A protein has these predicted regions:
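Extracellular adhesion/carbohydrate-binding repeat motifs centered on closely spaced tryptophans
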Residues: 1-218
Length: 218
């Protein structure tokens, strides 16, 4: 309201449809938000104004006050599941759901925190899966390392097992903070008795995901 220039701060703004009436109210709308009604940006979102007073734009991650955030070409902060492959080829808000359901691999995806926070995720998250990966109907534990999901690398078919329907399933033991956990190729943590073909043996993981040793009773 005072007309001061926004510098080194976040602002929550509505997307402009570049309507002439809007531009009469604020001559900077077109410059700041750059989205048309046909673009897939959220109707509202966070934008970061740099020390120069100019909004940051660019389909990339940016370090702000010691934390990384992801943006699209219009400067809108992205959050939660982000399709990293699609983000680089479009100016629209590439959140989850831009690809055909199940067409992406978890390797393509990045996870940043909810819109209220938005910075790059690290650690354990119990959450719904990615729509692009086809796991959005399930709530599971995932481990995120600098925005990337830990998952079983299915690059070698001889390291796969098969489920009761004959579908190939990859399960891999991954060491996190000195303890082993099991993940499938979609990044979902696994529990119970798991056969790890790469290790030629069975392992048991409790309900919290920890690999057990010694005698196990149910």
């Amino acid at each position: 309201d005072e007309g001061w220039r926004a510098e080194s701060q976040w602002l929550w703004l509505e997307k402009s449809g570049l309507d002439e009436d809007d531009l009469d109210d604020d001559d900077n709308l077109e410059v700041v938000l750059g989205c048309t009604e046909d673009d897939d940006c959220d109707d509202e979102g966070w934008y970061y104004f740099q020390s120069s007073g100019k909004v940051y734009t660019g389909a990339n991650k940016k370090k702000i006050n010691g934390r990384y955030y992801m943006f699209n070409n219009h400067g809108q902060m992205l959050y939660e599941w982000i399709n990293g492959t699609a983000k680089t080829v479009s100016s629209n808000a590439q959140l989850d759901g831009v690809a055909s359901a199940g067409s992406a691999s978890v390797e393509d995806m990045r996870y940043y925190n909810a819109v209220e926070e938005g910075w790059r995720a690290d650690g354990w998250y119990e959450m719904d899966g990615s729509e692009d990966v086809g796991t959005d109907g399930d709530t599971d534990w995932y481990y995120v390392d600098d925005g990337e999901i830990k998952y079983a690398d299915g690059g070698y078919k001889d390291e796969a097992t098969y489920d009761e329907d004959g579908k190939m399933v990859y399960v891999q033991r991954i060491k996190i903070n000195g303890k082993y956990f099991a993940f499938n190729e979609k990044g979902q943590m696994q529990d119970g008795l798991q056969y790890i073909n790469a290790d030629s043996g069975f392992y048991y993981f409790d309900e919290n995901g920890y690999q057990k040793t010694g005698r196990v009773t149910s």
